[in-house]
């Protein structure tokens, strides 16, 4: 990562209330380097520059620290190159993370990065999200997705995997508020509701971001 990208990462994390240690920064630099290297061979991300990686992958992923705590079990559905799972795991080291993607090459990359960074309690799994219900019903405190699907589809797939007091978090960009509003009827039919809608902007770029936080409705 170049110096500009490093400063963007530090600034963005600080604005989120995260003060990255030198070890954590080193992990992010290694991750960025491997992402750039592997992306020349396989389709991990359309984002190529160090600055965009710092903001649109790393800082964007870290916005989840507004909701996710440093304990419990988190599932990331459709994680691609490891976002938001790996950035979150770097800063929330006590969190147990399962990162799932249907593309095997992307999962292999995530496992490679996890080994390099010595990430404990991190599991990258090659499986479709629909196939998890039988083996992982009711096991997760948080289930997250970033640009994986629309909100009702995400909720329908993942609610069976959520603990009774757990949270689903859909990461959305511009238009997230309208999408959340439009999903309320479908969520009600599924036995879920929006517990919180967090709105903020990424540093420097000012791009809009929303965290749509959902919960099960008590029987």
From Swiss-Prot:
It holds the Pfam family GidB. It is found in: Cytoplasm. Transmembrane segments: none annotated. It catalyses: guanosine(527) in 16S rRNA + S-adenosyl-L-methionine = N(7)-methylguanosine(527) in 16S rRNA + S-adenosyl-L-homocysteine. GO terms for cellular component: cytosol. Gene3D superfamilies: Vaccinia Virus protein VP39. It is an enzyme of class 2 (transferase). Its EC number is 2.1.1.170. S-adenosyl-L-methionine binds at residues 78, 83, 129-130, 146. GO terms for molecular function: rRNA (guanine-N7-)-methyltransferase activity. The keyword Secreted does not apply. Keywords: Cytoplasm, Methyltransferase, rRNA processing, S-adenosyl-L-methionine, Transferase. Specifically methylates the N7 position of guanine in position 527 of 16S rRNA. Belongs to the methyltransferase superfamily. RNA methyltransferase RsmG family. This is Ribosomal RNA small subunit methyltransferase G.
